[in-house]
Amino acid sequence: MKTIGFVDFYIDEWHANNYPAWIEETCKKTGADFKIAYAWAESDRPPEGGLSTAEWCDKFGVKKCDTVEELCEKSDYILVL
C-alpha cells in the first residue's frame, strides 16, 4: 500500500474532507492501493471554527504528524491542499 500525506494551512476544509472518499472509491474501481495515512496543518483549527487537526485525524483514521518533516519522511506521496 502506498501512503498519502495531506499538508494544509488547516486540515478541516473542503478538499481534505472529500478527497479521502474519492481516493478510496477510485482505488476500488481501479485496483490501486493508496490510503490517506498522515496529515499535518500549520494552523490547528479553521478560523471560523471546525475540527482541530487531531479531531479531523480521528474522524478519518489518519495519523497526525507533529511536523511537516515527519509527514514527508513517512508518506510515499504528499498532497498539498
Model features per residue range: what roles?
Residues 1-81:
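N-terminal glycine-/serine-/threonine-rich beta1-alpha1-beta2 phosphate-ribose binding loop
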